Amino acid sequence: MINEIKKDTQQRMEKSLETLRTHIAKIRTGRAQPSLLDGIQVEYYGSPTPLRQLANVVAEDARTLAVTVFDRSLISAVEKAILTSDLGLNPSSAGTTIRVPLPPLTEERRRDLIKIVKGEGEQGKIAIRNVRRDANDQIKALLKDKEISEDEERKAQDEIQKITDTFVKKVDEILADKEKELLDF
């Protein structure tokens, strides 16, 4: 029973970490990364469709993304979607390829982005701590129902805490990498 709780806790914390990675990947660093455009939705036959399903996005160089649209008729819709996104990008089309130059980040903007990254990191840590709290509540319920002893409860809670510490450390590593990426460019 305790092993199931630990396994479930680890899986839920892994999902929290993956969510954090996804959110942080969307934060622009000044370096061209195809994942920057992952959140963009394009109007396609009346319904919003992810850009990834309609085009291929690659980093042409350190400051330019190249978006190759599969269907020529969608070029203007894709261009409009990129332009109206809150990323502050100005695409230009040439044939079936849309080039998206990334403007350099100002020092002030970098500081703002670091604050956003830290906020996302804190949300990730909160999610991980909430998972820990749920696991500890389940363990306390087992003790209350006399399914485990107090020693087993203490041991299980210590193990859950070790798992939590590992995941919080991973969050800190992700944040440090992103901050370094923002400052080094």
Curated annotation (Swiss-Prot):
Domain of life: Bacteria
GO biological process: cytoplasmic translational termination
Keywords, sorted A to Z: Cytoplasm, Protein biosynthesis
UniProt GO cellular component terms: cytosol
Gene3D superfamilies referenced in this protein's UniProt entry, alphabetically: 3.30.1360.40, Ribosome-recycling factor (1.10.132.20)
Entry's transmembrane regions: none
Pfam family, one: RRF
Subcellular location(s) of the protein: Cytoplasm
Disulfide bonds: none
A GO term, aspect molecular function: ribosomal large subunit binding
InterPro entries: Ribosome_recyc_fac, Ribosome_recyc_fac_dom, RRF_sf
Keyword DNA repair attributed: no
Main location: cytoplasm
PANTHER family from the UniProt entry: MITOCHONDRIAL RIBOSOME RECYCLING FACTOR PSEUDO 1, RIBOSOME RECYCLING FACTOR
Family recorded in the similarity comment: Belongs to the RRF family.
Role: Responsible for the release of ribosomes from messenger RNA at the termination of protein biosynthesis. May increase the efficiency of translation by recycling ribosomes from one round of translation to another.
Name of the protein this chain belongs to: Ribosome-recycling factor
Source organism: Histophilus somni (strain 2336)
